[in-house]
């Protein structure tokens, strides 16, 4: 399952993945990200919460890449990830190398509290 929200007042895109994510769910999430970012100006931040993710279909990878491309095209300032278990990275670090430019700051935290503290400190 994927959820995508945009808090315009905080200029924060929140992406959450939970349980088992299918390729179709990832595809819908990519479409939703593009819709929400349509009129967003550069410099917004992204919080990607993977605390409740159990697994992701390998076919979802291309849609995750589409999400990353949309974020990069709209020139996000930063991407903050919450991944409690580094072994459940699901290839995000590798995909990031190809889909985010060096101008996007990427940080990963094990807890949501640490991630939020990092975001609010910026």
Segment roles from a protein language model:
Residues 1-122:
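Amphipathic, Lys/Arg-enriched alpha-helical "gate/interface" segment within cytosolic domains
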């Amino acid at each position: 399952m994927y959820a995508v929200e945009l808090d315009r007042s905080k200029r924060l895109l929140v992406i959450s993945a939970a349980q088992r994510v299918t390729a179709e769910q990832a595809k819908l999430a990519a479409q939703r990200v593009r819709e929400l970012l349509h009129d967003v100006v550069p410099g917004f931040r992204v919080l990607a919460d993977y605390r409740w993710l159990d697994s992701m279909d390998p076919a979802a990878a291309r849609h995750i890449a589409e999400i990353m491309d949309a974020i990069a095209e709209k020139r996000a300032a930063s991407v903050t990830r919450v991944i409690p278990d580094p072994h459940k990275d699901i290839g995000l670090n590798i995909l990031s190398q190809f889909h985010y430019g060096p101008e996007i700051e990427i940080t990963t935290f094990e807890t949501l509290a640490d991630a939020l503290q990092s975001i609010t400190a910026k």
